[in-house]
Amino acid sequence: MVSDVSEPSDTTPEVVVQQQPQPKTLTHLISGASAGLISAISLQPFDLLKTRLQQQQRSNIKYRTTISKELKKLTHIRDLWRGALPSTLRTSVGAGLYFTILSSARNGISDYKRSSDSVSDTSILPKLSPFENLATGFIVRAVVGIITMPITIVKTRYESNIYNYNSMYEGFENIYLDGNQKGQGSLKNFFKGSFATLARDCPYAGMYVLFYELFKNDILTKVVPPIDETENGPITRSTIINTSAAILAASVSTTITAPFDAIKTRLQLSSIVASKKMTLWSATKDLMREDGGVKNLFRGLSLRFGRKGLSSGISWCIYEELIKSNFAQVIITKSDKKLV
């Protein structure tokens, strides 16, 4: 009877959970920001081309732009990284905040439930119900989206060929004074297209977390066979599962929210100097009136599809691997020692 009691106690989930303490908040911030920075720099060309495809199109068919036409307009390969500075600032800060707040929210819910089955075998992040994943992703994205909206406007205009900003300061100044001849600006200009952006990003983030956890914990763990990690170097089973889940989740979520991305870009590129104040409804009507009709709501989808898939695969994989490793914690410890 003694052996029967002692044997299962060595394999209970509680012991595994105790061996994997939850990372500190600053660890999530550093890991998320690092993942966002790498993703933004490597995938900036996708963002630039997508923005230019979604610019206002002329009715004459010969003026309608394509990816090949936009590539031919570039004089140097570095032009593909125009707007990289505001993009990296937005993505690194946004990703750091998003992962940190999301982790805190998910840990809070997990602690409240006090479930013994709250940890995945491929991740040390908490395991929640589908609705909880959807809700936390949705709400956290709304908070971070509002915080990073001003830099998002600068990024979008930087990437277009409508506004030829030479510096971020010029971009902020131009947006602040947009359409006002008397030199009196408005902070409201930095939140232009906020509703369309949140209508795209919040459902996307909610669905992304939902599908990511679904693919990671319920599908891919049954599909991806165990591998000998000693022979595959840095490539582990969890890396394959996390990356694949991120790409699949991003692909599904991107397709569903594509129309709001096109509307958001049109709103953020509009200027009250050129026309009357554009609204969500007027931007949608303008897009559908142009050659292509409803298809215009999905312009740039292939680029966003590729970028979001790769971005999610890169950022979530790097984030999860950094969280599981002691990389961020080592940085924090070293900085603390220097301060002492």
UniProtKB/Swiss-Prot annotation:
Gene3D superfamilies: Mitochondrial carrier domain (1.50.40.10). GO terms for molecular function: glycine transmembrane transporter activity. Solcar repeats lie at residues 23-108, 128-218, 237-325. The chain crosses the membrane at residues 29-54, 83-109, 134-159, 193-216, 241-267, 300-318. The keyword Protein biosynthesis does not apply. One of its GO terms (biological process) is glycine import into mitochondrion. InterPro entries: Hem25/SLC25A38 (IPR030847), Mitochondrial_sb/sol_carrier (IPR018108), Mt_carrier_dom_sf (IPR023395). It is a multi-pass membrane protein. Mitochondrial glycine transporter that imports glycine into the mitochondrial matrix. Plays an important role in providing glycine for the first enzymatic step in heme biosynthesis, the condensation of glycine with succinyl-CoA to produce 5-aminolevulinate (ALA) in the mitochondrial matrix. This is Mitochondrial glycine transporter. It comes from Debaryomyces hansenii (strain ATCC 36239 / CBS 767 / BCRC 21394 / JCM 1990 / NBRC 0083 / IGC 2968) (Yeast). The lineage of its organism: Eukaryota, Fungi, Dikarya, Ascomycota, Saccharomycotina.
